[in-house]
């Protein structure tokens, strides 16, 4: 189980986004998830631990795993996930929970996207989906999962082409 966060291009954003900067980038510093069947959320009691992160593309120095490392400092002192220089394109971040989440009746989910890299490095258009299932790689081949664990700048041409073909499909 986990979350899928899709950042989406939009004509209303500079460079078609998906971020709000002039060039379309964003920095997602931290993602937190909470679940409860009660009316109010207790940050300590209802927090769901996110233990895995991967993305279809990561900016050098800003990998997917940084979106769940808990470091929420502002600007370059912080960490996060970013997608430069692939602006104007849809991207996805898949987060997995450390253990399955038991859903009973009407469970409320709260997802917090923390974005502290200046005033414009925020996501302009996005979609969040809750994921269920046993495999964190549902819908993504093991070859692609393995490639996504490699920093973008360290991938060879064949690996980059495999990701491009997946993205294009």
Identify what each model region corresponds to.
Residues 17-26, 118-127:
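Extracellular carbohydrate recognition
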Residues 29, 93, 109, 126:
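Residue-level detector of short, conserved catalytic/binding motifs and their immediate flanks
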Residues 40-49, 115-116, 122, 127, ...:
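Substrate/cofactor-recognition hotspot
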Residues 4-6, 30-34, 127-129:
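Beta-strand signatures of extracellular beta-sandwich domains
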Residues 8-12, 134-136:
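Acidic glycine-/aspartate-rich tracts in secreted/extracellular proteins
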Residues 1-5, 102-113:
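Noncatalytic modules at the cell exterior or secretory-pathway interfaces
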Residues 8, 34-105, 150, 163:
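Disordered, acidic Ser/Thr/Pro-rich linker "stalks" and the adjacent N-terminal cap
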Residues 6-9, 112-121:
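Short beta-strand-plus-loop segments that form exposed binding edges in beta-rich domains
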């Amino acid at each position: 189980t986990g979350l899928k966060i899709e950042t989406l291009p939009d004509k209303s954003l500079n460079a078609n986004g998906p971020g709000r900067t002039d060039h379309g980038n964003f920095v997602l510093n931290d993602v937190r998830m909470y679940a409860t069947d009660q009316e109010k959320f207790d940050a300590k009691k209802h927090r769901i631990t996110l233990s895995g992160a991967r993305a279809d593309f990561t900016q050098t120095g800003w990998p997917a795993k940084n979106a769940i490392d808990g470091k929420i400092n502002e600007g370059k002192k912080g960490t996060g996930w970013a997608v430069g220089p692939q602006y104007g394109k849809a991207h996805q971040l898949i987060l997995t929970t450390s253990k399955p989440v038991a859903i009973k009746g009407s469970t409320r989910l709260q997802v917090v996207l923390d974005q502290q890299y200046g005033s414009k490095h925020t996501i302009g258009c996005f979609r969040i989906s809750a994921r269920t299932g046993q495999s964190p790689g549902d819908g993504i081949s093991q070859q692609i999962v393995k490639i996504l664990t490699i920093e973008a700048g360290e991938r060879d041409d064949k690996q980059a082409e495999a990701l491009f073909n997946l993205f294009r499909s």
